[in-house]
Amino acid sequence: MTKVFCKKYHQELDAIPFQPLPGELGKKIHNEISNKAWQAWLAHQTILINEYRLNLIEPKAKEFLKEEMYKFLFEGKEEKPEQFSEI
């Protein structure tokens, strides 16, 4: 499997086997983010969708997730919703 130096975890890890999004952001994620970080984002994204009851048909919800994804993957910011508690 191909390796990348992951911007989130600051180490060389397995790459995502595909470009997860179209466009420049998708290329950036594919080239700079590991599969481990991408899987962590998918889990975090699920929390955000459920806790904020996001409707993914709405452009505003999609933009919110895109901003949160960038913060999570490239800026190291992983803020969970205030009302969220892990069981």
Curated annotation (Swiss-Prot):
Gene Ontology CC, one term: cytosol
Iron listed as a keyword: yes
UniProt keyword list: Iron
Protein name (database record): Probable Fe(2+)-trafficking protein
Origin: domain of life: Bacteria
Organism the protein comes from: Francisella tularensis subsp. holarctica (strain LVS)
Classification via InterPro entries: Fe_traffick_prot_YggX, Fe_traffick_prot_YggX_sf
SUPFAM superfamilies: YggX-like
GO annotation, biological process: cellular response to oxidative stress
